[in-house]
Design a protein with these regions (language model features):
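N-terminal glycine-/serine-/threonine-rich beta1-alpha1-beta2 phosphate-ribose binding loop
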Residues: 54-164
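Glycine-rich phosphate/pyrophosphate-binding beta-alpha loops
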Residues: 367-369, 373-379
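Oxidoreductase and adenylate-handling cofactor-binding alpha/beta cores
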Residues: 206-219, 233-242, 272-286, 388
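Substrate-binding/catalytic subdomain of NAD(P)-dependent oxidoreductase enzymes
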Residues: 237, 246-351, 356-358
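Asparagine/serine/threonine-enriched low-complexity, disordered tracts
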Residues: 17-28, 32-35, 39-42
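N-terminal amphipathic/hydrophobic targeting modules at extreme N-termini
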Residues: 7-14, 64-65
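Rossmann-fold NAD(P)-binding glycine/threonine-rich loop
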Residues: 155-160, 173-210
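A conserved regulatory-domain signal marking ACT and ACT-like small-molecule sensing domains
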Residues: 384, 389-502
């Protein structure tokens, strides 16, 4: 660029800016005129005019309004346990990178905890407070991160933060599954963001694809392994032949399971996540109370061995399906359930081992999609929290809000009796003539078709392992009740659903 071209470019761009920004250039007006006259009188005017036009298209540096750096976005953190402490560390260690990605610095201004007398390495003690309510009500707080969990006081604190104009990032699956509608409505009314990627499957990005990337598609099913504790237990039972109690104790020793493992092993944790996934996938509000739930505490080594014998593996699955059947309101029904199930070893979810999570999505246009990764732990969950934090911070800088809740449908949730799938039934029977015929008749009378039968054992008793074709859950339950009344049936040892192709 020639020395006479730069003033023209700057001079033309300055017309779009306020006069106080242009005043330093006023004394150069004669210089501008002289240079323009030079171009007019010079030979090759056409070429000069072309150069003049080209020059004016180059952008000048955007001036700052007052020459001062923009103030930081102030962050309040609720909770400083495994996840919260990792979030606090990342906010400090990655401060420069976060600044570059957002365009504004993030400043951690307070951390709400239950007790102040605990030592928390690497975090400024002056940040800690036990007054969470006062922290979220501060007028200078722009962003609130909630990682304390549970229903209360988390719900009240999030609502207060939203009402005071702060955007919120939460990892609270239990609260979202119970009363997410109230929180989303409050965020929309306040014109701020409520993000929750970390609430489901840890570091796996599944909420955003369902909420944004696939929003133009029709999702027909979401099937996931969304609890790392139970997946670790079932994987060890499969690969090492260990029993449930033994493997649970091992998981507790390694920190994969809590001292009270009920929420994990009885499926409560997975049910909350299933409710969130179903709400996102089907644009209809589903709560944890709508989710049918069974845990894995009754899964035996015999179940694991039986699954292996038919080329399957046992997993605790969160299953969300869009049905073709319609409810009374004309909306298509959805089925949302959590329970152990046998799936073929060829299924993508079958190879998910250890404490890992995975979510398998099927949609009308995109087809089959698989999301896989670590589903729990401080670092993976903190990664998801920070991802949301960057997004809501960018929205804050632009003065905008991201997508809100998309629950425009009111889809009825089908009861478990209406679910249609295959079943694996293990029976202890007397090894007498006609027993197989009587059992087959029992299945037929209740409209359940047998796909395969396998007999094990010799002597006075035998074990029959039956896999059915697809049938309604209600029909299968009636069949099991009838089987228990047969004289030749000693025991219905186990009943487990079979998912996947077959």
């Amino acid at each position: 660029m020639g020395k006479n071209e730069l003033p023209l470019a700057v001079g033309q761009r300055l017309r779009d800016h306020p006069r106080d920004d242009t005043e330093p250039f006023t004394n150069n007006a004669g210089h501008f005129r002289n240079n323009t006259e030079h171009f007019r009188n010079d030979a090759g005017a056409d070429e000069r005019r072309e150069a003049e036009v080209t020059t004016t298209t180059e952008p000048a540096a955007r001036p700052q309004s007052d020459g001062q750096p923009m103030p930081p976005l102030r962050v309040a953190l609720l909770g400083c346990g495994t996840v919260g402490s990792e979030v606090a560390r990342l906010l400090t260690d990655s401060a420069d990178d976060l600044h570059a990605r957002i365009g504004r610095r993030l400043e951690l201004v307070g951390i709400a905890v239950r007790r102040l007398n605990r030592t928390r390495e690497g975090i400024d003690p002056a940040l800690f407070t036990t007054d969470a309510a006062a922290l979220v009500a501060r007028s200078d707080v722009d962003l609130v991160i909630e990682v304390i969990g549970g229903i209360e006081p988390a719900r009240s604190l999030i609502l207060s933060a939203l009402q005071h104009g702060a955007s919120v990032v939460t990892a609270n699956k239990a609260l979202l599954a119970e009363d997410g509608g109230t929180l989303f409505a409050a965020a929309e009314q306040a014109g701020v963001d409520l993000y929750f990627e970390a609430a489901v499957a840890g570091a796996i990005p599944i909420v955003r694809p369902l909420r944004e990337s696939l929003v133009g598609d029709e999702i027909t099913s979401v099937i996931g392994i969304v609890n790392g504790t139970t997946n670790y237990i079932l994987d060890k039972m499969d690969t090492e032949g260990a029993g449930f109690s033994e493997t649970l104790a091992d998981a507790q020793t390694l920190g994969y399971a809590e001292a009270d493992p009920t929420a994990d092993v009885e499926g409560f944790d997975a049910a909350a996540k299933a409710a969130i996934l179903a709400s996102l996938a089907f644009h209809s509000r589903v709560t944890a109370a709508d989710v049918y739930r069974e845990g894995i505490s009754e899964v035996t080594t015999s179940d694991i061995a039986s699954a292996r014998a038919i080329g399957s593996v046992v997993k605790l699955l969160a299953i969300c399906e869009l049905s073709d059947a319609e409810g009374d309101n004309g909306q298509r029904r959805v089925s949302v359930r959590v329970h152990p199930a046998m799936i073929p070893r060829s299924h993508p979810l079958a190879s998910v081992g250890g404490a890992y999570n995975a979510v398998f999505v099927e949609s009308r246009s995109a087809g089959r999609l698989m999301f896989y990764g670590p589903g729990a732990g401080g670092s993976p969950t903190a990664s998801a929290v920070l991802g949301d934090l960057v997004t809501v911070a960018r929205n804050r800088v632009r003065g905008a809000a991201g997508p809100g809740e998309s629950s425009y449908a009111a889809r009825p949730v089908s009861p478990i009796d209406d679910v249609v799938t295959r079943y694996h039934i293990s029976l202890e029977v007397a090894d007498v003539t006609g027993v197989l015929a009587s059992i087959a008749t029992c299945f037929a009378e209740h409209g359940v078709s047998i796909q395969t039968v396998r007999q094990q054992g010799r002597g006075s008793d035998a074990q029959l392992v039956i896999v059915t074709h697809r049938a309604r859950d209600a029909a299968l339950s009636a069949t099991v009740r009838a089987l228990r009344s047969l004289e030749a049936v000693r025991e219905v040892a186990s009943v487990m659903r079979v998912e996947g192709e077959g």
